[in-house]
Every structure is written in C-alpha cells, then in structure tokens.
Amino acid sequence: MAAAKQKGFKAVPLNLTASLNFENDIARKASKNVVGVMKGTKRPDEYVLYTAHWDHLGRCTAAADGDDICNGAVDNATGTAALVALAEGFAKAGAPERSAVFLAVTAEESGLLGSKFYAENPVFPLSQTVGGVNMDAFSMSGPAKNLTVIGKGKSQLDLYLEAAAKSEGRTPETEPTPEKGFYYRSDHFSFAKLGVPMVYFEGGDDLVTGGKAAAMAAAEDYEKNRYHAPGDEFDEKWDWSGVMSDLKLYYRVGRMLAMTDAWPNWNEGDEFRAVRDKSRSGK
C-alpha cells in the first residue's frame, strides 16, 4: 500500500482471489419541482429560464460534535434565495417582453433528477425557451474583480454575460479546471443536452480584498470543511456584497434576454448545436 502511494508506481499481480456479495436497499421517494412564471407583454410564448436547485443531502456523515444534518446553506440555499430575489426584482421592474420562468428543481444532489424531469416534461416548451441561467452555490467571501464562466465559449449567451459584466466593471474568465467537467455537473446540463442554451458562472477567483490568494484560501476552506458536510450552515459573518454583485449580473443577463427578439444559439461546432437547430426547425 505504501508503494502504491509513490510516484511512478506500477500495478503488480497479487496472486489473490476474492469473493464478495452485498445487499442493496432501494428507497423510492417523491419530491417536487417548483415553478413560477411572469408572463411577457409582447412575446408571452417565448421563455427565459432561471434555475436553482432547492434540495440538499439531508442526513450525512456526522461531524465531530455529532451533527449529521447537511443543511446546504451555501449549496444551495443561496441559489434558491437568489431565485426568489430575482423573481421579486422582475416583479418590481414590471413584466418584460418575453415570459420569465423561475424554476426551483429538486434532487440535483441525487444526479440532476429534478431538472432532468422538467426538461423531459416541460411546463413550457423547450423549443420556445430562448435560453437560461443556472445558479448553484454563491461565494460568501466578498466581491470579485472577475467572474469564472463555466463552459465559456460554448454559446452566444457569452455576449450577454460580457455586456452585463462590463456594466459592473468585471471581467469574465474561463474556468481554470475544465477537465473537472463542472459544466456537466449542475442543472443547466439537463437543458443544454436538449438544446437550450444555458449560462453558468461562479463569483470569481480574484477578490477585491485579498486577490487570488484570498479567493483560493476561501475556496479550499469551504471544500475541506463545509462542502457536502454539516458545516455548510448559515454564518452571520458572511459577506453578502459579492452575492449582490453576482445577482446583478444574473438579473441583467435574464432581463436582456427577456427584452429582445433575438434567439442566441450554441456556437458553431458545439456539441449541443445540432439538437438546438433541430428543435427550432420543428423537425
């Protein structure tokens, strides 16, 4: 075992055999997606989508103090709260030209099941869904100079995000670790694979206070001590200014989409382009 942990280790035959058997219990449960819509004034049959997952893990591996409740305060109560705040913002601004859909999906942590179910059984046709934005876990470390776009370069929605970011003095940047496949690990993927252009970004890795070093330290601390663990709880010391900055971008992107007659598509050659073209052609 010690040798296997060393660089350059190569597998060796153990000349052993093993026989295993195990039992599995299957629990069937029902959970709900929650959807709200603000009807558009000029093109009510065209839809702009906001998504966030409201579920988390429930009980999980207990912490040292015995707490075994995974509350999911950051992941994803922050996104769910943002969804409600955006709906309130749209209501205060007045109905846009296109309809705005606010979708809180369940069972993301169980394999994107809620968004998958909606995408396959949509309340509003995906062929008439212009595009959307997904929100999954906001950074509570304060405002950033940049924003990290997951899947940057995939669709024409980047243009809307770039315009929104410019108005806030921020710079969209490509995710530093695309090999981790984050674009395929949250609810926007359920819609993307059926053709709907979706944008997803994170708060940024260059904080206004502390720069990249502070951002990395905060991210590592969250992943080590709170991510999918009982420690992901509300903290009165949270810095909400970064959340508000990100929320403005989500609002601007959705509002711009809802106030235009343009139909942004996946960029030429993208894996989801063909299914979108087929959906829009009605074939």
Identify the role of each PLM range.
Residues 1-2, 43, 95, 105-223:
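Metal-dependent peptidase/peptidase-like ectodomains
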Residues 48-51, 97-106, 131-134, 267-269:
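Beta-strand segments within the central parallel beta-sheet cores of soluble alpha/beta enzyme folds
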